Design a protein with these regions (language model features):
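Phosphate/adenylate-binding glycine loop and adjacent helical scaffold
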Residues: 49-88, 93-97, 101, 117
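Short, low-complexity, polar/charged sequence segments that are solvent-exposed and flexible
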Residues: 61-64, 175, 207-210
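Generic structural signal of hydrophobic/aromatic residues within well-ordered alpha-helices
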Residues: 7-11, 62, 66, 79-82, ...
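Catalytic core of the SET domain in histone-lysine N-methyltransferases
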Residues: 1-23, 84-194
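Charged low-complexity "KEKE/polyampholyte" interaction tracts
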Residues: 1-36, 41, 46-55, 197-345
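Noncatalytic linker/hinge segments flanking ATPase motor cores
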Residues: 75-88, 194-198, 228-233
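Short, hydrophobic/amphipathic alpha-helical patches that form generic packing surfaces
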Residues: 77-85, 134-143, 286-294, 331-337
Length: 345
């Protein structure tokens, strides 16, 4: 469309790179595709066009960037035009509206279970059907980190997510799509590291098959070793995954623990590695992992049952995310049980 061409031209004039790209509907909804399937594509949004997350406000139907946003006038005019013609306006915020409509209508017991098991942040319990919440959620779904600051990234944010694509790149001058071979298919990148299906749903409102699934909060005491294992149930990995309290107290605290994985034996390896500083034997660790995996399947299955009863015939992205995770954890549970049998035979 002419609107799209004008936006791309202005983007380039302001220092943006938009090589061989077009926008249209695909399997994942609206996305970015190559114009010429035999050539590579690239989007690079320079830092002068990055919009500070806290500088957007709603004025009537449109988004406005605050005067003290630090953006030059031409850049600000482009960003406002981009949001109002494409990203927020013109049904660009439709998916955010659908997510909020579904989430705010959920029965309180379901929301409370989601929060108790750390599938959502407690701030999501305050979501309302209001313009303020719509904008807050819209920004959260699109925010990138650049030099320690939360920013929105016009043009680059139109690229859809795949867990099996490389991540977007942060350079000194801005953010860009990862290099990829020309194969004619939709341009995709990974939004963030080791996402689980549930953390994708929480952060972006959609579900997708993921490589790993993380455990809910638990505290289990192994009496014969006078050791308590506590997991805080964070739904994404941590750089320092283990916080060992002094071993005399016999408490081992973990922020996040993989319980299901495409590499089906990885959860057991992770737990064995965490407990390698203790005296706990392999058989006890395998039994503990089986207990944790069953607990995680059970909790998700109960939640899914409640959800499906509430949703009747429509299947939400949340239901899909729970189903993905249950399957992934079940596969890993089978692998753990096989390892236990092998070691016992």
């Amino acid at each position: 469309s002419n609107e799209w061409k004008n936006l791309v031209n202005t983007f380039k004039k302001l220092g943006g790179i938009a090589e061989n790209i077009d926008i249209h509907e695909g399997e994942l909804g609206r996305g970015i595709f190559p114009q010429d399937k035999t050539h590579r594509s690239l989007i690079a949004t320079p830092k002068n066009i990055l919009v500070k997350s806290n500088s957007l406000q709603i004025k009537g139907e449109n988004l406005k960037i605050l005067g003290d946003s630090g953006m030059a006038q031409k850049e600000r005019e482009f960003a406002e035009q981009y949001y109002n013609e494409l990203s927020w306006g013109n049904e660009g915020n439709k998916d955010t509206k659908i997510f909020l409509g579904h989430f705010t209508s959920l029965p309180e017991p379901i929301k409370n279970k989601l929060e108790k098991n750390r599938f959502i942040d407690s701030k999501m319990l305050n979501y309302k059907r209001s313009d303020e919440t719509l904008l807050e959620r819209f920004i959260d779904e699109r925010a990138f980190k650049f030099k320690g600051e939360s920013v929105l990234v016009p043009m680059l944010e139109l690229v859809n997510h795949s867990n099996f694509a490389p991540p977007f790149r942060v350079t000194r001058t801005g953010l860009e799509t990862p290099p990829a071979e020309a194969n004619g298919s939709e341009i995709l990148h990974k939004y963030s590291g080791k996402n689980s299906a549930m953390s994708l749903w929480r952060s972006y409102g959609f579900s997708a098959k993921s490589i790993v699934s993380y455990g809910i909060p638990f505290e289990i005491t192994i009496n014969e070793y006078s050791t308590t294992v506590r997991c805080y149930g964070q739904q994404e990995p941590e750089s320092n995954e283990i916080k060992l309290k002094n071993s005399e107290s016999g408490l081992i605290s973990i922020n996040s623990l993989p319980v299901g994985c495409e590499i089906s034996t990885l959860p057991l390896s992770a737990l064995s590695s965490i407990l390698s500083t203790t005296e706990i034997d392999g058989e006890t660790i395998r039994n503990l992992m089986i207990f944790i995996q069953k607990l995680n399947i059970e909790t998700r299955s109960e939640l899914l049952k409640d959800l499906l009863e509430y949703e009747q015939n429509s299947i939400s992205e949340l239901s899909k995310a729970l189903k993905h995770e249950i399957q992934l954890i079940q596969t890993s549970l089978i692998a753990t049980e096989l390892l236990r049998q092998e070691n016992n035979s």
